[in-house]
Amino acid sequence: MNTQQLAKLRSIVPEMRRVRHIHFVGIGGAGMGGIAEVLANEGYQISGSDLAPNPVTQQLTSLGATIFFNHRPENVRDASVVVVSSAISSDNPEIVAAHEARIPVIRRAEMLAELMRFRHGIAIAGTHGKTTTTAMVSSIYAEAGLDPTFVNGGLVKAAGVHARLGHSRYLIAEADESDASFLHLQPMVAIVTNIEADHMDTYHGDFENLKQTFINFLHNLPFYGRAVMCVDDPVIRELLPRVGRQTTTYGFSEDADVRVEDYQQIGPQGHFTLLRQGMPDLHVTLNAPGRHNALNAAAAVAVATEEGIDDDAILRALESFQGTGRRFDFLGEFPLEPVNGKAGTAMLVDDYGHHPTEVDATIKAARAGWPDKNLVMLFQPHRYTRTRDLYDDFANVLTQVDALLMLDVYPAGEAPIPGADSRSLCRTIRNRGKIDPILVSDPAQVATMLAPVLTGNDLILVQGAGNVGKIARYLSEIKLKPQIQEEEQHG
C-alpha cells in the first residue's frame, strides 16, 4: 500500500489504516463481493475464497484481489481481519484457522458499518424492493453529480457492477434483514419498503420479533436522521408511532407525504405523478414496469428531495433507469419457427423474485405491460422452509399465469421437508383446476418441455432465486430452441 493510498484510507476510515489485508469467506456472493470491491478500490489488499468462479470473482480478480476456489486454513494467512457471509458455517476451516490465529472474524454488515461510519449513510431495508430501490437512489445521486459510493445486493446495470467507490460523503447501501445483521448499521437516512414474514428462522418464528428488529434498526438513526417508509404497507403503518425519528411516508395512500397518483404502465415503462408536500408535483416516466417499482421510485424521490437534489436530475435518472440484474431483466425476444414451428415470437424475462408477494408483483407488471401475451412461467421454489411456510400463498399466486413449469426446490443447504416440495405444490395447483403445472425434474430438458406451451405471442418469466438465473441465460443463448443433446452447462 503506497503513501497516497494510506492517506486516502485515513480520510475515509481513520482507524482502519491499521488494517492491511482483508480476507472474505464466500467472496463470490453479491453482497460480499460488493464490499470487497469498494475496499479494493480504497487500496486494501483483498483476498477471498469461494467454491467456483463467477462474474463477481472475475471482477475482483481484475482489481487485483487474490481468489481461492477452495476453503483451506492457509488462505487466511497474514489477514488482518476475516469477513464472513451468513451462509458460511462456523466450522469452515478458514474461520477455525482465523480464530486459532486470533484474527478478528466479523460479519459482512460489520464491515459495511465501518465504511458507513464516516460517511452520510443511506440504508435501504425491507422484505421486498431493496435492491431496485438502492439502485434508484444511487442513480439519482449519480445523475445529480454527487458521485456516491454504493453497495448493492444485485448488479446495477448502468454501472455494470454491484458496488462502486465514489469520492463524495454519500454511501448508499442495501441493508439485509435476513440474518438481522443490518442492526450493525448506523445510517443517516433509512428506507423501509415493506415488512413481511420471511427469514423467520432468524427470528425464531416470531413475527413480533421481526417487527421489533426493524424498529431497533430505525433507532440506530441519530435523532436528526430520517426514516422513509411505505405507508401502504399495513405493518409499517402499525409501526409508525413507535419509530421515534423524523419520518417521511410514501405510497399510493392519500395520507402519504410523497404520493403516487395516476399510475399507468405502457410496455416496460411506468408513468405517474408524485405529489410532494410543499413541493411541485413531479410527472415521472420510470423505465421499470409495475406499481411496485413506482413505490420504489417514490422512496428514492423522497430521499433525494430531502437532500435538495434538483428535480430535473431526479426525472432524468428515473427515465433512463436501467434496472438491476435479474429484476424483470429482459433477455431478448426470439422467433418461434426454429423452436416449435409456429409463427410469432416469445419474450424472455428473468426475475429474482422468490417470495409470493414478489412473484405476484412480477406477474401483475407483465399483465399490465403486455396484456395480450400468453404468460408462461418457469418457477424454481427457493428453500424448503419458505415453501412450507408460504405454501398456500405460492399456490394462489402461481395460478395467475397461463402456463407453469416448475423446477425442483432449490434447497440452499436445507434438508427436504415432506409436503414442501415442487411435486406437492404442482399437485395442489392442479387440484384448483385453473392450470395444469408441468414438473421439470431435469433442468437439461427445460427447452424441450417449454416449446409445446409456446403459442407465438408469449412472455416467458423465469422466476426464482436459486440457479434458475443460469437456466434463463442458457435459454437466451440457445434462443429457446431445444437441443438434440441439451448439456447441463446452465445448472
UniProtKB/Swiss-Prot annotation:
Domain of life: Bacteria
Biological process terms in GO annotation: cell division; cell wall organization; peptidoglycan biosynthetic process; regulation of cell shape
Known catalytic reactions: UDP-N-acetyl-alpha-D-muramate + L-alanine + ATP = UDP-N-acetyl-alpha-D-muramoyl-L-alanine + ADP + phosphate + H(+)
Enzyme class: ligase
Molecular function as annotated in GO: ATP binding; UDP-N-acetylmuramate-L-alanine ligase activity
InterPro entries on file: Mur-like_cat_sf, Mur_ligase_C, Mur_ligase_C_dom_sf, Mur_ligase_cen, Mur_ligase_N, MurCDEF_pg_biosynth, UDP-N-AcMur_Ala_ligase_MurC
Binding, ATP: 126-132
Main location: cytoplasm
Enzyme Commission identifier(s): 6.3.2.8
Cellular-component GO terms for this entry: cytoplasm
Pathway per the UniProt entry: Cell wall biogenesis; peptidoglycan biosynthesis
Biological function: Cell wall formation.
Family: Belongs to the MurCDEF family.
NCBIfam families tied to this protein: murC
Protein name: UDP-N-acetylmuramate--L-alanine ligase
